């Protein structure tokens, strides 16, 4: 809304020590490949860098309305009524911990979360979309309609049905296309 670009430091679906950088354009979309290559070339050319630490790193600010605006946008993208649904979410101790439960709850679902206590080093650690075993077990043992497993930065999702079976991306696309057709 008010920014020309954005940068996310993320391990995505990797361990915390494999952080990388994701760049976004002014629309919040992934930056165009041509521009990314230009940025990478510029960064590769920097050889005489002084590393900074502590108070010298930079400026931190919190965009107070950012989370609310983002969650409203998510609900606009998929305006569904989830009333009566019981959803179990594996949040991978990642970024979905601040949005998933509240967003799904506001759409009417009853939501329970696991891997919902990030501490900076437990992201994706034997949980989330790369390790859905606990979610699968809880789906078989519990009374849930659907299980959702995110990766650390919540840009990947796998689903688990009430029998604990994984639903791959093809099946998720099938569900989405049926919904859009109806």
Residue positions per predicted region:
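Glycine-rich nucleotide phosphate-binding loop and flanking beta-alpha elements
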Residues: 14-15, 95, 154-156
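Short beta-strand segments
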Residues: 8-12, 90, 149-151
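Short, ordered loop/turn segments at secondary-structure junctions
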Residues: 11-12, 28, 36, 116-117, ...
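Acidic, glycine-rich loop-and-beta core segments that form the ion-binding/anion-interacting portion
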Residues: 128-182
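Gly/Ser/Thr-enriched, mixed-charge loops and adjacent short helices
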Residues: 19-140
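Structural motif
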Residues: 4-7, 22, 86, 110-112, ...
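Ferredoxin-reductase
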Residues: 1-26, 181
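Short glycine/serine/threonine-biased micro-segments
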Residues: 4, 18, 26, 92, ...
């Amino acid at each position: 809304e008010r920014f020309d670009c954005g940068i996310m430091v993320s391990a995505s679906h990797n361990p915390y020590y494999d952080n990388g950088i994701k760049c976004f354009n002014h629309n919040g979309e992934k930056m165009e490949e041509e521009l990314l290559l230009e940025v990478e070339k510029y960064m590769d050319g920097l050889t005489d860098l002084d590393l900074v630490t502590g108070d010298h790193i930079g400026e931190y600010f919190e965009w107070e309305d950012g989370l609310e605006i983002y969650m409203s946008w998510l609900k606009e993208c998929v305006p569904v009524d989830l009333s009566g649904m019981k959803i179990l979410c594996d949040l991978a101790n990642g970024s979905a911990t601040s949005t998933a439960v509240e967003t799904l709850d506001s759409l009417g679902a009853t939501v329970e979360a696991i891997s919902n206590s990030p501490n900076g080093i437990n992201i994706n650690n034997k949980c989330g979309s790369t390790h859905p075993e606990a979610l699968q077990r809880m789906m078989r043992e519990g009374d849930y309609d659907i299980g959702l497993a995110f990766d650390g930065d919540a840009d990947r999702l796998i689903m688990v049905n009430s029998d604990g079976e994984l639903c791959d991306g093809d099946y998720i696309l099938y569900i989405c296309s049926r919904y859009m057709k109806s």
